Curated annotation (Swiss-Prot):
<dbReference type="InterPro" id="IPR005290">
    <property type="entry name" value="Ribosomal_uS15_bac-type"/>
</dbReference>
<comment type="function">
    <text>Forms an intersubunit bridge (bridge B4) with the 23S rRNA of the 50S subunit in the ribosome.</text>
</comment>
<dbReference type="GO" id="GO:0003735">
    <property type="term" value="F:structural constituent of ribosome"/>
</dbReference>
<dbReference type="GO" id="GO:0022627">
    <property type="term" value="C:cytosolic small ribosomal subunit"/>
</dbReference>
<keyword id="KW-0687">Ribonucleoprotein</keyword>
<dbReference type="InterPro" id="IPR000589">
    <property type="entry name" value="Ribosomal_uS15"/>
</dbReference>
<dbReference type="GO" id="GO:0019843">
    <property type="term" value="F:rRNA binding"/>
</dbReference>
<protein>
    <recommendedName>
        <fullName>Small ribosomal subunit protein uS15</fullName>
    </recommendedName>
</protein>
<dbReference type="GO" id="GO:0006412">
    <property type="term" value="P:translation"/>
</dbReference>
<keyword id="KW-0699">rRNA-binding</keyword>
<comment type="similarity">
    <text>Belongs to the universal ribosomal protein uS15 family.</text>
</comment>
<dbReference type="Pfam" id="PF00312">
    <property type="entry name" value="Ribosomal_S15"/>
</dbReference>
<keyword id="KW-0689">Ribosomal protein</keyword>
<comment type="function">
    <text>One of the primary rRNA binding proteins, it binds directly to 16S rRNA where it helps nucleate assembly of the platform of the 30S subunit by binding and bridging several RNA helices of the 16S rRNA.</text>
</comment>
<dbReference type="InterPro" id="IPR009068">
    <property type="entry name" value="uS15_NS1_RNA-bd_sf"/>
</dbReference>
<comment type="subunit">
    <text>Part of the 30S ribosomal subunit. Forms a bridge to the 50S subunit in the 70S ribosome, contacting the 23S rRNA.</text>
</comment>
<keyword id="KW-0694">RNA-binding</keyword>
Length: 89
C-alpha cells in the first residue's frame, strides 16, 4: 500500500529544495499526504480493514505533528504548503 518509487521521486522533486531533499518537513508532509490519499481509496473498498486504519491514523497524527512544527518554524512555508496540498486549515 505504499507509493511507487516514481511517485515518491516526483513528490520530492516538486516539494523538495533539490532532487535529493527527502528529509525536509515539506517533503515529509507531502509524502504523508499522498500516502493518506492513497489509503482513502483503499478504505472505500475494504471497510473492515481495521489494521490498516490504525496505520492511517498514525500517518495522520505524524502529519499533524510535522505541520505544527512547520507552522512554529516557518509560517510562510506552512501557508504555502497547505495551499499547494489543499489541506483544510
Amino acid at each position: 500500500m505504499s507509493l511507487s518509487t516514481e511517485a515518491k521521486a516526483q513528490i520530492i522533486a516538486e516539494f523538495g529544495r533539490d532532487v535529493n531533499d527527502s528529509g525536509s518537513s515539506e517533503v515529509q508532509i507531502a509524502l504523508l499526504t499522498a500516502q493518506i490519499n492513497h489509503l482513502q481509496g483503499h478504505f472505500s473498498e475494504h471497510k473492515k480493514d481495521h489494521h490498516s486504519r490504525r496505520g492511517l491514523l498514525r500517518m495522520v497524527s505524524q502529519r499533524r505533528k510535522l505541520l505544527d512544527y512547520l507552522k512554529r518554524k516557518n509560517v510562510t512555508s506552512y501557508t504555502a504548503l497547505i495551499g499547494r496540498l489543499g489541506l483544510r486549515r
